[in-house]
Amino acid sequence: MKDRYGRTIKYLRLSVTDLCNCRCVYCMGENGVPRLPHSAILSFEEIEEIVRAAVSLGVTKVRLTGGEPLVRRGIDELVRRLRGIEGVEELAMTTNGARLAEYAEALKEAGLDRLNVSLDTLDPEKFRRITRIGELRDTLDGLDAARRAGFERIKLNTVLMGGVNDDEIAEIAALAKDGAFDVRFIELMPIGECTDWDRRRFLPAERVLEYLPKGERVPSGGVAELWRPAGFRGTVGLIRPLSQRFCADCD
C-alpha cells in the first residue's frame, strides 16, 4: 500500500479509547475530554476487522494507543486477538505506565512485543504537576513489572519542556546506559493549552546532545534521530516535529 506521495505504508496506529487516567499539561485540559458514547468506540471485533484489512494491504506493524490503552477493559484479550492475525509481525503499545504493573504479565503472555512508556521526569512532585493526577511510583513499578515479564528494550518517551525537565536530561538519558531502555526525547508541540505557553518552554531536541557523552549516530528506521553515547548499550533518540520537518520520512 502506498500513499499519494509514494510512501509504502506498513505501520498502523490504532486508538482503542479516548479516555486517559492522566491529565498531562501538554496533552489535554484539566477536566479531560468529553466521554464518547459507547457506540462511537470501536469494538474489539471492529478493530480486528480493521487490522485484517490493513494487513491484506501490506501493514506489518500495529501499535495500540489511546487515550490510555490500559484503561480499555479487556485490553489483553484484544492483544491476543490481534496477535493471532497472520501477517502482524510486530504488535506494540504506547502507555503512560500507570496501570502497567497490573497488566504487564498478561500483555506479554497475550503476545505484545514492544512497549513505549511516557516518562517526562524522575521527580515525584514534577510528575504530579505534569500529569495533574498521576504518581511517578506507579509508572516506575510498571516499568519494573514489564522487565520482569520479559519485555526488552522498552522505549521511554520524554517530552522536552524548558524550565520543567531540561535539568533532568542527563539523568533520564542515563536510563539507556545498561540497555534495558531506549530513551526518546520529543520536542513539545504548540497544541491545546501549550499554545499560550512561554516560548522558553519549547526546546530544540538537539539541546539533548549537550548533556550526553560523545557518541555515534545509529541508523534509524523511523522518525527518531538515534545516538549511542559512549558507554551506553541503549540508544538516545531525538524526535523533532518543530525544528526539523520529518513528515516525508514518516509512514
Predicted region positions:
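Glycine-rich beta-alpha junction loops
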Residues: 160-164, 187-192, 242
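Class I S-adenosyl-L-methionine
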Residues: 167-173, 189-198
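N-terminal [4Fe-4S]-dependent radical SAM core
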Residues: 1-13, 23-25, 56, 224-239, ...
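Canonical Radical SAM [4Fe-4S] cluster-binding loop centered on the CxxxCxxC motif
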Residues: 4-44
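Conserved G/P- and acidic residue-centered "switch" motifs that form tight phosphate/ATP-binding loops
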Residues: 68
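A short, flexible beta-alpha/helix-coil linker loop
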Residues: 31-35, 122-124, 190-193
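Accessory C-terminal segments flanking Radical SAM cores
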Residues: 192-251
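Radical SAM/AdoMet-radical enzyme domain recognition
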Residues: 41-63, 71-176, 182
